[in-house]
Amino acid sequence: INFLTTPSIEFASMKNWEGTVGELLDYMFDPTMTWEDLKWIRKQWDGTLTVKGIQNLDDAKMAAKLGADAILLSNHGGRQLDRAPVMLHLLSDIKKEFKKDYEIHIDTGIMHGADVLAAVALGAQYTYVGRAYLYGLMAGGQDGVERALEIMRTQMVRNMKLLGVNSLDELTPKHVRFLNRQ
């Protein structure tokens, strides 16, 4: 890849934006949103409602109380909020407070098949793998994405064998150990 003498990479989603990516993010995220807005959205939308960006137990409880069908634990990849709670640590605390069938998703820190297994073992019904997907996309387009996902699948299968489990349903919190949780 020749970044020095070829034109800069352009993102289709940024063609009409004059500022930087950081300025676009500042523009897109609305700091005036409140729980009242979630109440309004719930009244307007009768479909499944998942609230993204949950970073503590109180917010998880509030989202559920206001009618969210699911919560998505996220520090938005940790790039902007690199001092936010570790979502896998938060997951185990939140799962203790919610019914078994309440949907909990996690999208931060999933970079290896073992991360998927840890999230499932701690109670997540869904994990999101944006970073691996994007790295694969940047490196090799669709083939790169398929390869990245295949690597994660292989890691999951290998780690399940090492843990002595045959299905995701067999995973429990006893299969997860945290390093230096404070």
Predicted segments — roles?
Residues 1-61, 65, 77-80, 89-92:
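Active-site entrance/lid segments in N-terminal catalytic domains of soluble metabolic enzymes
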Residues 41, 63, 71, 119, ...:
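Conserved, mostly hydrophobic/aromatic
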Residues 44-48, 64-78, 98-101, 123-127:
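Glycine-enriched alpha-helix->loop->beta-strand junction motifs that scaffold or abut catalytic
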Residues 52-54, 73-76, 107, 129-130:
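Generic beta-strand/beta-sheet core signal
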Residues 61-64, 82-84, 116-118, 139:
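Short, well-ordered secondary-structure micro-motifs
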Residues 75-85, 134-137:
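Glycine-rich, proline-tolerant flexible connector loops at the mouths of alpha/beta enzymes
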Residues 89-107, 111-182:
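Alpha/beta catalytic cores of nucleotide-metabolism and tRNA/nucleoside-modifying enzymes
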